[in-house]
Amino acid sequence: MLSEAVRCLDHALEQQKYAFMTQEGIITLEPDDIYYFEYQSRKVVINSSQGKYIAAYSLKELYEKFSKYHFESSHKSFILNLIHIKSIKGFDIYMKNGDVVPLAQKRAVDFKKRFHDFLQSAFVEI
């Protein structure tokens, strides 16, 4: 019964769509469609499966909303969706879409641990 409730909650979280006010207008994205957020020139670039969009949000605000969907900060300018990480080599994170994102030295140990924990939980659920 409890596992069924958790599964329903996970499904509801996956189906959640978020509206973003961007320079192109309002767009809606599911968390799984977002590869990462990048802070650049006082704006946030939303890198997604539907393209790149520029919006006026803070990374702190986005992290608070998206950390429950397995988003983590690899660098002061990046928040990544752990689902879309292909591999980590040194201080470079290779994303499934082909982008390479930096991993800050001071965040490396904690980020790699969180990624490892995420992978462990993903394999247990299968």
Where are these regions (language model features)?
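Conserved binding/recognition cores within well-folded domains
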Residues: 2-96, 100-102
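C-terminal structural segments of small proteins and small subunits
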Residues: 100-105, 109-112
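Inter-domain helical "communication" segments and dimerization helices
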Residues: 1-17, 110, 114-126
